[in-house]
Amino acid sequence: MTSEEDRRDFDALLARVPLPDRAKSELSAMMESDERHYHGVGHLALLWRRHRLYAAAEGLSAPEIETLIACAIAYHDCVYERGRRDNEERSAEVWLRASAAAPLSEEDRNWVADTIRATADHLAYPNPAADAPLRERARAWVLDLDLTPLGEADADFDRNTELLRLEVPHLTDAQYDAGRLAFLRRLSDAPLVYRTPTLAAQFEAQARANFARQLVGD
């Protein structure tokens, strides 16, 4: 069940997405599907809260770039079909169709689509230099925001693990644990989980503590 806080922040997120009400209603319906336990309204609301809290420190709170960040957050998980490996590509396609008549340039629309596609493998995106173009840093920011739940306190991290398990009932416990631990191991082996200094300062240490706790004896 969506909390009042999550509903408020999800609505605030949608208010920054320059699409017609019909498109926003369709997105809301997708995100409120009964099959979504983790990748739903609450997840998007959390990312938007964290963006609003920390973006200014990274120089990413100006209206133009914030609009694009809002669009990427809003649509990055809009297609979430268990067992498929093309959810990100299909989410990008939904975004491109929904935004076809939006007051955005083709460059802007494609930036959002490519950012959505990049969430298929957060670690594959190169670490942008401190003086990198704004849009390169903004893409890394969206990817890092999406990983911030990995840096939650123990109890919240464990609850997220339970919610993720509910989204894949077709897997056995052994299959789920194998995939989950492989993902955590890859993150643990990475030099950095978060490429943006502000989010690294807030979440890196706790994320690595969570990985270590989960991988003990693995």
Which residues does each predicted region cover?
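Histidine- and acidic-residue-rich, metal-dependent catalytic cores
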Residues: S91-P126
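Short alpha-helical hairpin
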Residues: L13-M30, H43
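Divalent metal-dependent phosphate-bond-processing catalytic cores, especially two-metal-ion Mg2+/Mn2+ enzymes
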Residues: M1-L13, E32-H39, R49-S61, Y75, ...
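Secondary-structure capping and boundary motifs in well-ordered enzyme cores
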Residues: H39, P63-T67, D108
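An amphipathic alpha-helix signature
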Residues: R7, D11, K24-S25, W48, ...
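His-Asp-centered metal-binding catalytic motifs of divalent-metal-dependent phosphohydrolases/nucleases
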Residues: L47, E66-R82, S91, V112-A120
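Active-site metal-coordination segments of metallo-dependent hydrolases
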Residues: D34-L46, Y80-R90
